[in-house]
From Swiss-Prot:
This is Hydrogenase maturation factor HypA. Involved in the maturation of [NiFe] hydrogenases. Required for nickel insertion into the metal center of the hydrogenase. The keyword Metal-binding applies. Belongs to the HypA/HybF family. The keyword Metal-binding applies. Pfam families: HypA. GO terms for molecular function: nickel cation binding; zinc ion binding. Ni(2+) binds at residue 2.
């Protein structure tokens, strides 16, 4: 399960950006063509955040659909796999979205001093 290593990296990046502040929420964008399983990330998140500033944080995942642009006609089509056929019959597609993995938002607890 490569999601465990991916989740460890996400926790490390968020921890670095939080600079010691308690993290309340993390929003990820995961492309549907990325071969990353959101449910596995959720499972690993609970394990990887134990004893960190992310412990107890809410994890939200926004799944980004696959979208391709035809090199022949310029048309755009939604993809559920990294290849497809355009309405014009061409298989020459460039992926626009669907392979991403982004930490989109981090919400931290504000400390009043």
């Amino acid at each position: 399960m490569h999601e465990f290593g991916i989740t460890q990296n996400i926790v490390a990046i968020v921890t670095e950006h939080a600079k010691g502040a308690k993290v309340q929420r993390v929003l990820l964008e995961i492309g549907k063509l990325s071969a990353i399983m959101p449910d596995a990330i959720r499972f690993c998140f609970d394990i990887c955040t134990q004893g960190t500033v992310l412990e107890g944080a809410t994890l939200e995942i926004l799944e980004i659909p696959g979208l391709g642009r035809c090199r022949q006609c310029g048309g755009e089509i939604y993809l559920d796999k990294p290849f497809g056929i355009c309405n014009c019959g061409s298989v020459q597609l460039d992926l626009i979205t669907g392979e991403e993995l982004k930490i989109k938002e981090i919400e931290i607890e504000e400390l009043c001093v």
